[in-house]
């Protein structure tokens, strides 16, 4: 049996931080994304989830339910008939929530400047990160996720608990 000696002369190992930083670190490193692929950009989003780019190492896991997601990734052309459904999905996501608009069609409507196309997802829901390109490479999407992680780490953790009314 091996004997281990611990030298406490230099003090105990202590980590000093705040609760806000700890919560934001946890949030930024465990992003559960709602993969909302509407057109060709969804192919690049699926490639980003594969073994070559391995988004799991960043803590990003794709989910099918908005109730289990914190990040909504809109990739592709959004039609006006589909806009109400998109808003409903966004409203079903728990707070805090973030949105990434991926590709030219999601950002500005792309080449589809018609009456039936929403000319930018930000007209329907608030967007945090825009990824340009047609279709953007997985590296661009990866960079956008890293920017979102930095943004989350800088935000203040909300601890507001609304009192429940009994009457």
From Swiss-Prot:
Cystine crosslinks: none
Cofactor details (free text): Binds 1 [4Fe-4S] cluster.
Swiss-Prot/TrEMBL cofactor(s): [4Fe-4S] cluster
Main localization category: membrane
Gene3D superfamilies tied to this protein: 3.40.50.12280
Cellular component, GO, one term: respiratory chain complex I
PANTHER family registered for this protein in UniProt: NADH DEHYDROGENASE, NADH DEHYDROGENASE [UBIQUINONE] IRON-SULFUR PROTEIN 7, MITOCHONDRIAL
Purpose: NDH-1 shuttles electrons from NADH, via FMN and iron-sulfur (Fe-S) centers, to quinones in the respiratory chain. The immediate electron acceptor for the enzyme in this species is believed to be ubiquinone. Couples the redox reaction to proton translocation (for every two electrons transferred, four hydrogen ions are translocated across the cytoplasmic membrane), and thus conserves the redox energy in a proton gradient.
Name recorded for this polypeptide: NADH-quinone oxidoreductase subunit B
Organism for this UniProt entry: Campylobacter jejuni (strain RM1221)
């Amino acid at each position: 049996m091996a004997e281990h000696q611990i030298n406490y002369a230099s003090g105990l190992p202590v980590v000093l931080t705040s609760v806000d930083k700890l919560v934001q670190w946890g949030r930024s490193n465990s992003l559960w994304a709602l993969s909302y692929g509407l057109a060709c950009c969804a192919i690049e989003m699926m490639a980003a989830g594969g073994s070559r780019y391995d988004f799991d190492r960043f803590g990003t896991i794709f989910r099918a339910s908005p109730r289990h997601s914190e990040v909504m990734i809109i990739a592709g052309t959004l039609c006006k008939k589909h806009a109400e459904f998109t808003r409903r999905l966004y409203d079903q996501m728990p707070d805090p929530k973030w949105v990434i608009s991926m590709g030219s069609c999601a950002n500005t409507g792309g080449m589809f400047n018609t009456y039936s196309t929403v000319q930018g997802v930000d007209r329907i829901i608030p967007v945090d990160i825009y990824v340009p390109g047609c279709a953007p490479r997985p590296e661009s999407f990866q960079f956008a996720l890293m920017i979102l992680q930095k943004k989350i780490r800088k935000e203040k953790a909300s601890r507001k608990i609304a009192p429940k009314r009994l009457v």
